[in-house]
Regions:
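Acidic/histidine-rich, metal-coordinating catalytic segments
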Residues: 69-89
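RNase H-like two-metal-ion nuclease catalytic core shared by retroviral integrases
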Residues: 75-76, 87-88, 108-130, 145
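Mobile-element integrase/transposase regions
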Residues: 1-43, 51-55, 102, 190-207
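Two-metal-ion acidic nuclease core segments, chiefly of the RNase H-like superfamily
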Residues: 90-108
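Active-site-proximal acidic segments at structured loop/helix or strand boundaries
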Residues: 126-226
Length: 302
């Protein structure tokens, strides 16, 4: 049975997954975060390398910046959201998600177990993305894919949809945003957008399947990272300064940074053409000292 919600009262969110074939012919999966306003159909999608909790938080924050914060979000029983239910059926929230709800000021409602159709609006959105946005889609980097995704959202939100009998942008601006909260910038928000990472023994952090270098003079064990478009920024653990930045090429090769290992030192260069030349020979064969033994016969070579 179809139900209705007041403007700005309820959004629905979910993950979808799509298989990507790269230039070498191998395949991997990317996750599509989807959120939709149940009242007007305003929608937002974003792609991530995986559906980990840190990417759920980033996707939700970007969606709230795009369409405001509702009274509650309806979702299914994700591991990132809920641990289990108690004897009375009340949800026991995952501790980081519960803190996230408190910091941003919204509530979460869960579908009944094995009843995903309760959030039919976002289920249809995920299916629509797979049927409308993705077929024939070619991209070079996930950053490009997300730029195309937000343009697609802007287009879809600006045209009439019979299911909600309105143009989502118009109704959302006129009615939903009067009740939805505007997401304000805060230090807590920046922490969610910049996940924490441990620094490896060889001076790298691992993010989105790639390794990025950290300057050697930063001596703490953790830092924070944020991908903004085509640039990855690495911050200190307290978000007080940028340690370094990397161009995000999505290559599997390690990305080194300046001052990752040693400090650059002054070096003298020839000021005139070098005319003197000497010769270097190949080193003599290495004699390990065991060549006089005949190990196969157990005898000395004499």
């Amino acid at each position: 049975q179809r139900y209705h919600t007041a403007p700005g009262e309820s959004y629905q969110m979910d993950w979808g997954f799509v298989e990507v074939e790269n230039a070498s012919g191998s395949t991997y999966k990317v996750a599509c975060f989807a959120m939709i306003c149940h009242c007007c159909g305003q929608r937002y999608i974003e792609f991530f390398p995986n559906a980990k909790q840190e990417n759920l938080f980033i996707g939700m924050i970007h969606a709230f910046l795009y369409m405001g914060i509702p009274e509650h979000v309806l979702t299914d029983n994700m591991k990132s959201v809920v641990i289990r239910r108690d004897e009375q059926g009340h949800p026991i929230w995952q501790k980081d998600y519960e803190l996230f709800m408190g910091n941003l000021g919204f509530e979460t409602k869960l579908c009944k177990p094995r009843h995903p159709f309760t959030k039919g609006s976002v289920e249809r959105l995920v299916r629509f993305v797979k049927d409308n946005f993705l077929p024939g889609r070619v991209f070079s980097e996930i950053t490009d894919l997300n730029y195309e995704a937000i343009r697609w959202c802007n287009t879809q939100n600006s045209i009439y949809h019979r299911a909600v009998d309105c143009i989502p942008n118009d109704k959302h601006t006129m009615f939903c945003m009067k009740n939805a909260s505007v997401l304000e910038e805060s230090i807590e928000l920046s922490y969610y957008l910049c996940p924490e990472r441990k620094i490896s023994f060889d001076g790298f952090v691992h993010y989105e399947g790639r390794r990025f270098g950290v300057p050697y003079w930063y001596t703490e064990k953790t830092c924070r990272v944020k991908r903004d478009g085509y640039i990855l920024y690495i911050y200190d653990s307290k978000m007080t300064k940028v340690l370094t930045s990397h161009d995000v090429t999505w290559s599997r090769r390690d990305s080194f940074c300046k001052e990752q290992y040693v400090t650059e030192q002054p070096e003298e260069r020839p000021t005139a053409p070098v005319k003197v030349q000497i010769q270097q020979l190949n080193p003599p064969p290495y004699d390990s000292g065991f060549s006089k033994f005949n190990f196969e016969e157990g005898l000395w070579d004499e």
